[in-house]
Amino acid sequence: MEKIIVSELTSFIAHAPTAFHTVAELKNLLNRDGFEELHESERWEIEPGKKYYVTRNNSSIIAVKVGTDLDDYSFHVTASHSDSPSFKLKENAEIEIAKRYTMLNTEGYGGMICSTWFDRPLSLAGKVMVKNGNRLETHLVKVDRDLLMIPSLAIHMDRKINEGRPLNKQVDMLPILSGSVKGPGAVKKLIAEELGVSEENIYGMDLFLYNRMEAVRWGHDDEFIGCPRLDDLQCAFTSMKGFLTAENNRNINVYACFDNEEVGSGTKQGAASTFLYDVLWRMNKALGKDEEEFRRAVASSFMLSCDNAHAVHPNYRQKSDETNCVYMNEGIVIKSHAGQKYTSDAVSVAIFKMICEKAEVPVQFFSNRSDEAGGSTLGNIAMSQVSMNTVDIGLPQLAMHSAYETAGVKDMEYMVKAVTEFYASNIRGDSDGNFRI
C-alpha cells in the first residue's frame, strides 16, 4: 500500500502546479467515484445516500457524502489547502535588460524560502480568462517544458554570498525567459499558443511559477520523499483518499480544500470566507432540515484541520521544542499552541487520539519553542464562520516552504487510515465537553 500511495501522490502533485490545478485533480478523483458537481449559482437538489461537490474560484473545493440515516446526524469535516508559496506574474510582466535578456516581473506569493528557487528549471501555470462571444470562460494552463530559470550570482562576484545576504524579491528573484528581446506581450502570446486561442481573446491571467523538478524517493531505505508542494498537497491528497474510502450512513461527511492559506485565507475562496458555512447550510436546507437541526448538528460536528508540521531537523535540533519533538515516519502530528494559532484542546485531542487508537495509527505532539512565534494554519480561521470542535494535525516534514520539500513515506499511509476511521466514526456530543464516539 505504501508504494501505491507514494506513486499516486507524486502523480497528483506533478499534475497540480497551482491551486487551480489541484482542484482540477481533486475533481477528477471525485468524478471517477461518482460524485455530482453542484454550482453555487443554481438550486440544489440533494438526496440521502448521494455524493456531491462544489468549487469556488476554481481553486477551492468542498465535497460531501450524504448519509441515509440522518435522524441524529453531524458533519465530519477535513480541511486542507490547495496553495503553496510561489511567485506570481505581474501584469505587463516582460522586462528588457541590456537589449539582450527578457526577464519576468513577479511578486512573492506566501512565505517561500527564496534561495531554494535559484538554479532550478521553472515554468508557468495558472488560470486564464478567455472571451468566447459574449462569454468569459475559464481555462487552466500549464506550460509543460523548462521555460524559466533564476540563476544565482557567482560567488566570485559576491564573496559574502554564503553569509546570509538578504534577497530582494524585486531584484534578485526575477526569472529569465529569453536571451533575446521578446517585447511586451510575449507571455500572452506564449499562453495563447498553449491554449490555441487568439491573444486578443485573453482578458485575464493568474499565472505562477512552478518548480519542474520531479519527486524522488530517497534515503538508505527509501524512507523519504522529496517533492515540490508537499505542504499542503500531501494532506490534501491523503485526506481525500480517506474520504473516498470511508462509509458512514449516519453522518454528512465533508471534504474541504481551501485556497489562499499561505496568504492569510482572507479571500472569497479562503478558509475565512463563508464557503464552508454556505455549503453546510445549503445541504442541510436541501435535505429538509430546519435551523434548529442544523445548529444541533454543528454542535456535535468535528473537524480535522490538516496541514503539515515541522519535523526535527538533524542539523538544527535546537529549533524544536525540548519535549515535543516530532519525526518523519513516526506518525501523525497533533499541533497545539497556547495562543490559539492551532485549534487543538483537551477535548479535540482526546477525540482524535481515540480515533487513531481504533485505526492503530501512532500520533506525535508538536508545540513551538516558547521563544519562537511559529506559523499558523486554517483551522482557527474557519472557526470564525462555523464553529465546531477541531484538532490541528499534519504530517511531519523538513524544509517547509522550500521549492523542494522532504517528508516520510510511512506517514501517508497513517494519515489515510486515520482519516478513513474518522469519517467512519459517529461522534456525538451528549453535553458541553462530553462525547460518544
Give the positions of each predicted feature.
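N-terminal hydrophobic/helix-forming segments and targeting peptides
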Residues: 1-437
